[in-house]
Protein backbone atom coordinates (compact mmCIF):
# COMPACT_ATOMS: atom_id res chain seq x y z
CA UNK A 1 0.00 0.00 0.00
CA UNK A 2 1.18 3.50 -0.80
CA UNK A 3 1.41 6.31 1.69
CA UNK A 4 0.18 9.48 0.03
CA UNK A 5 2.54 11.60 2.14
CA UNK A 6 5.18 10.49 -0.41
CA UNK A 7 3.27 12.48 -2.99
CA UNK A 8 2.70 16.13 -2.06
CA UNK A 9 -0.15 17.45 -4.20
CA UNK A 10 -0.44 20.63 -6.24
CA UNK A 11 -3.43 19.21 -8.07
CA UNK A 12 -5.32 15.98 -7.62
CA UNK A 13 -8.35 14.34 -9.21
CA UNK A 14 -10.11 11.20 -7.96
CA UNK A 15 -12.75 9.46 -10.08
CA UNK A 16 -14.99 6.58 -9.04
CA UNK A 17 -14.94 4.06 -11.90
CA UNK A 18 -18.23 2.14 -11.86
CA UNK A 19 -17.12 -0.16 -14.68
CA UNK A 20 -13.82 -1.28 -13.11
CA UNK A 21 -13.11 -4.41 -11.10
CA UNK A 22 -13.30 -3.93 -7.33
CA UNK A 23 -9.53 -3.56 -6.85
CA UNK A 24 -9.39 -0.71 -9.42
CA UNK A 25 -12.64 1.06 -8.48
CA UNK A 26 -10.98 4.41 -7.71
CA UNK A 27 -8.57 6.25 -10.00
CA UNK A 28 -6.34 9.13 -8.93
CA UNK A 29 -4.15 11.55 -10.87
CA UNK A 30 -1.82 13.61 -8.70
CA UNK A 31 0.67 16.30 -9.72
CA UNK A 32 3.17 17.54 -7.15
CA UNK A 33 4.20 21.19 -6.82
CA UNK A 34 6.88 22.15 -9.34
CA UNK A 35 9.69 21.97 -6.77
CA UNK A 36 8.78 18.32 -6.02
CA UNK A 37 7.80 17.19 -9.54
CA UNK A 38 10.64 15.03 -10.80
CA UNK A 39 10.88 15.35 -14.60
CA UNK A 40 7.68 17.48 -14.53
CA UNK A 41 5.71 14.24 -14.07
CA UNK A 42 2.58 13.34 -12.16
CA UNK A 43 1.37 10.02 -10.76
CA UNK A 44 -1.65 7.85 -11.48
CA UNK A 45 -2.89 5.41 -8.84
CA UNK A 46 -5.68 2.89 -8.32
CA UNK A 47 -7.52 1.80 -5.19
CA UNK A 48 -10.31 -0.51 -4.12
CA UNK A 49 -11.68 1.88 -1.48
CA UNK A 50 -10.36 5.38 -2.25
CA UNK A 51 -8.31 5.40 0.97
CA UNK A 52 -5.48 2.93 0.42
CA UNK A 53 -3.67 3.20 -2.91
CA UNK A 54 -1.95 0.09 -4.18
CA UNK A 55 -0.29 1.07 -7.46
CA UNK A 56 1.17 4.07 -9.15
CA UNK A 57 2.42 4.95 -12.59
CA UNK A 58 4.62 7.95 -13.29
CA UNK A 59 3.11 10.06 -16.07
CA UNK A 60 4.72 11.83 -18.95
CA UNK A 61 5.64 15.52 -18.67
CA UNK A 62 2.91 17.85 -17.41
CA UNK A 63 2.65 21.23 -15.76
CA UNK A 64 1.17 21.92 -12.35
CA UNK A 65 -2.66 21.89 -12.21
CA UNK A 66 -2.81 19.05 -14.72
CA UNK A 67 -5.83 16.83 -14.09
CA UNK A 68 -7.88 13.98 -15.55
CA UNK A 69 -11.50 13.00 -16.02
CA UNK A 70 -13.49 10.19 -17.59
CA UNK A 71 -15.46 10.59 -20.81
CA UNK A 72 -18.28 8.01 -20.46
CA UNK A 73 -19.48 8.52 -24.04
CA UNK A 74 -16.15 7.59 -25.60
CA UNK A 75 -15.18 5.32 -22.68
CA UNK A 76 -11.82 7.09 -22.45
CA UNK A 77 -9.70 8.50 -19.66
CA UNK A 78 -8.80 12.07 -20.55
CA UNK A 79 -5.69 13.78 -19.24
CA UNK A 80 -6.00 17.57 -19.24
CA UNK A 81 -2.32 18.49 -19.33
CA UNK A 82 -1.34 22.04 -18.46
CA UNK A 83 1.64 23.52 -20.17
CA UNK A 84 3.66 26.63 -19.74
CA UNK A 85 6.63 25.55 -21.78
CA UNK A 86 6.68 21.94 -20.48
CA UNK A 87 5.21 20.56 -23.73
CA UNK A 88 5.55 23.59 -25.92
CA UNK A 89 4.53 27.20 -25.94
CA UNK A 90 1.08 28.50 -26.71
CA UNK A 91 0.26 31.86 -28.27
CA UNK A 92 -1.75 32.69 -25.13
CA UNK A 93 0.49 31.51 -22.26
CA UNK A 94 -0.84 28.68 -20.13
CA UNK A 95 -2.78 26.17 -22.23
CA UNK A 96 -3.99 22.58 -22.28
CA UNK A 97 -2.76 19.54 -24.10
CA UNK A 98 -4.94 16.44 -24.48
CA UNK A 99 -4.30 12.74 -24.02
CA UNK A 100 -6.98 10.06 -23.99
CA UNK A 101 -6.78 6.32 -23.54
CA UNK A 102 -9.18 3.48 -22.75
CA UNK A 103 -6.84 2.12 -20.04
CA UNK A 104 -6.15 4.52 -17.18
CA UNK A 105 -2.64 3.39 -16.17
CA UNK A 106 -1.44 2.72 -19.72
CA UNK A 107 -2.75 6.11 -20.83
CA UNK A 108 -0.82 7.81 -18.04
CA UNK A 109 2.49 7.01 -19.72
CA UNK A 110 2.98 9.53 -22.51
CA UNK A 111 5.68 11.40 -24.36
CA UNK A 112 5.42 14.77 -26.09
CA UNK A 113 4.57 12.90 -29.30
CA UNK A 114 1.52 11.26 -27.65
CA UNK A 115 -0.29 14.46 -26.67
CA UNK A 116 -1.99 17.07 -28.83
CA UNK A 117 -2.61 20.76 -28.32
CA UNK A 118 -6.17 21.15 -27.07
CA UNK A 119 -7.12 24.70 -26.14
CA UNK A 120 -6.13 27.98 -24.54
CA UNK A 121 -7.65 31.30 -23.59
CA UNK A 122 -8.21 33.66 -26.50
CA UNK A 123 -9.34 37.19 -27.33
CA UNK A 124 -12.91 36.35 -26.22
CA UNK A 125 -11.65 35.98 -22.62
CA UNK A 126 -11.63 39.49 -21.18
CA UNK A 127 -8.77 40.63 -18.95
CA UNK A 128 -9.26 41.89 -15.42
CA UNK A 129 -9.40 45.71 -15.81
CA UNK A 130 -7.16 46.20 -12.76
CA UNK A 131 -4.25 44.24 -14.26
CA UNK A 132 -5.04 44.28 -18.00
CA UNK A 133 -2.95 41.14 -18.56
CA UNK A 134 -3.79 38.59 -21.26
CA UNK A 135 -6.00 35.87 -19.71
CA UNK A 136 -4.57 32.34 -19.63
CA UNK A 137 -6.22 28.92 -19.34
CA UNK A 138 -5.25 27.72 -15.87
CA UNK A 139 -7.32 24.54 -15.67
CA UNK A 140 -9.92 22.60 -17.65
CA UNK A 141 -12.00 19.76 -16.25
CA UNK A 142 -15.15 18.08 -17.48
CA UNK A 143 -17.79 15.58 -16.45
CA UNK A 144 -20.29 13.56 -18.45
CA UNK A 145 -23.87 14.56 -17.70
CA UNK A 146 -26.81 12.88 -19.44
CA UNK A 147 -25.74 13.16 -23.10
CA UNK A 148 -23.14 15.96 -22.97
CA UNK A 149 -19.72 16.68 -21.52
CA UNK A 150 -19.82 19.73 -19.25
CA UNK A 151 -16.50 21.53 -19.12
CA UNK A 152 -15.33 24.10 -16.61
CA UNK A 153 -12.58 26.47 -17.73
CA UNK A 154 -10.54 28.19 -15.03
CA UNK A 155 -9.09 31.40 -16.50
CA UNK A 156 -6.10 33.07 -14.84
CA UNK A 157 -6.31 36.87 -14.79
CA UNK A 158 -3.09 37.88 -13.00
CA UNK A 159 0.37 36.44 -12.35
CA UNK A 160 2.16 34.72 -9.46
CA UNK A 161 4.32 37.76 -8.69
CA UNK A 162 1.31 40.10 -8.47
CA UNK A 163 -0.53 37.76 -6.10
CA UNK A 164 2.55 37.17 -3.93
CA UNK A 165 3.23 40.90 -3.64
CA UNK A 166 -0.39 41.47 -2.57
CA UNK A 167 -0.23 38.48 -0.17
CA UNK A 168 -3.29 36.83 -1.73
CA UNK A 169 -4.17 33.91 -4.02
CA UNK A 170 -4.06 34.33 -7.79
CA UNK A 171 -7.25 35.65 -9.37
CA UNK A 172 -9.09 33.16 -11.57
CA UNK A 173 -12.59 32.97 -13.03
CA UNK A 174 -14.61 29.84 -13.76
CA UNK A 175 -16.37 29.71 -17.13
CA UNK A 176 -18.62 27.00 -18.53
Task: Tell what function each PLM region has.
Residues 1-138, 143-176:
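Beta-rich carbohydrate-recognition and catalytic domains
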Amino acid sequence: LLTLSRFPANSCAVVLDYDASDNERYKMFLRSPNADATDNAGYCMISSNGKQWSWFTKTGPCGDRSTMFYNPFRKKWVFSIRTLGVLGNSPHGRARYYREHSDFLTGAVWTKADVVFWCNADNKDTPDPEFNLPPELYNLNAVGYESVMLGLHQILLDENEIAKAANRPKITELKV
